[in-house]
Amino acid sequence: ATKQETDRAMAGFLKRLVPKKFRKEGVVIPVVRLQGAIMASGSQFRPPLNLATAAPALEKAFAYKDAPAVAISINSPGGSPVQSRLIFQRIRDLAAEKNKHVLVFVEDVAASGGYMIALAGDEIFADPTSIVGSIGVVSGGFGFPEMLKKIGVERRVYTAGTNKAILDPFQPERESEIEYLKSLQLEIHQVFIDMVKARRGPKLADDPDLFSGLFWTGSRGRALGLVDGLSDMRSELKRRYGPKTRLELVSAPKGLFGRKSPGI
């Protein structure tokens, strides 16, 4: 038996020693919701999902001493790979530090960076119609050199360093710049692929499209090994920990003027 299983068995034994009238009925599972586009910064009208906004609630949830697990609900189309990986790592660090099982539940979507965060789960569940995957890297923008010519505007750029103005949208693209950008994308993509392989391992199907950037429904994602089961949070937690299990939504503590305090 694992240490976690031994601890649970011991906790159950000790609980039975307490007179029934003094026992707390049902297991309490802390729930953290991670939703929205993953960005380093945003606005009060469109709050971002990043480590600073996610960390306080995560720290609070993993501090539930008697909870055997932490449930994380994810609803994100992705965004910054850096912030995605930082959130992933914080969840794994807390899980190891507090000895908690992590159950991830995908709502509408956990794609790209959203799926990267989902990899922090020891188990991943999704709705059959959820969207999962999109294991790839994309970047884009616009170019305006011809427009400037038409309106009679001359672009003047002065640099110290031959590549300081690389990918300037007001200058024609150069093949060398495109190749450099692609090399960065490939490097980031490989980090993502390595994370998926490390976390999902032998569960993954041998499918050539798995790391192509495609996305799938939860049902197909299960067949590909991207998710472990098709279920909703409430049903799965009650099935696992008993019908009296209570789900407790955890949010970031509020600071001065009622604003949520950012974490680090």
Label the model's feature ranges.
Residues A1-D127, V138-I264:
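N-terminal organellar transit peptides
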Residues I131:
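Short glycine/proline-centered loop/turn elements that form peptide/ligand docking sites
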